[in-house]
């Protein structure tokens, strides 16, 4: 039996060596697979992080762009409010000019106009009583306007209302006001 025991022992010893060899190979293969999977996971992580970083930068850039645009729009709105305020002050100043200045303006403006004998002069309401007896070489209407003056020629109205005059020059005035107030 000892021969049989030797054979069995030898077979067991060979099986044990083979088992160790197989386990060794399996462990090495396992380590390679784990290493490969870790590398793949790291690459995927890097890809995801780069994509997330890129998306975050895109979101940040879009948000920053919106903030800049909103800020610019607010600045433009504020500038427009200032310009509108200046235009209103111009209208108010013209409307509230002294009687003497109004009379000079009126005389000067009328001298440049080709007036007919049927034309009617419509004066500014707050200046009417003071100027109704003046001679402007044109008939005086009983009607009044809020500011400036008008000439009535039949059904035609030549409007020299200060508000209308300023409004008709608004584009040019806005440019000049902006240049003066907001030059860099």
From Swiss-Prot:
The keyword Translocase does not apply. GO terms for cellular component: proton-transporting two-sector ATPase complex, catalytic domain. GO terms for molecular function: ATP binding; proton-transporting ATP synthase activity, rotational mechanism; proton-transporting ATPase activity, rotational mechanism. Keywords: ATP synthesis, Hydrogen ion transport, Ion transport, Transport. SUPFAM superfamilies: F1F0 ATP synthase subunit B, membrane domain (SSF81573), V-type ATPase subunit E-like (SSF160527). It comes from the Bacteria. The keyword Ion transport applies. InterPro entries: ATP_synth_B-like_membr_sf (IPR028987), ATPase_V1_Esu (IPR002842). GO terms for biological process: proton motive force-driven plasma membrane ATP synthesis. Produces ATP from ADP in the presence of a proton gradient across the membrane. Belongs to the V-ATPase E subunit family. This is V-type proton ATPase subunit E.
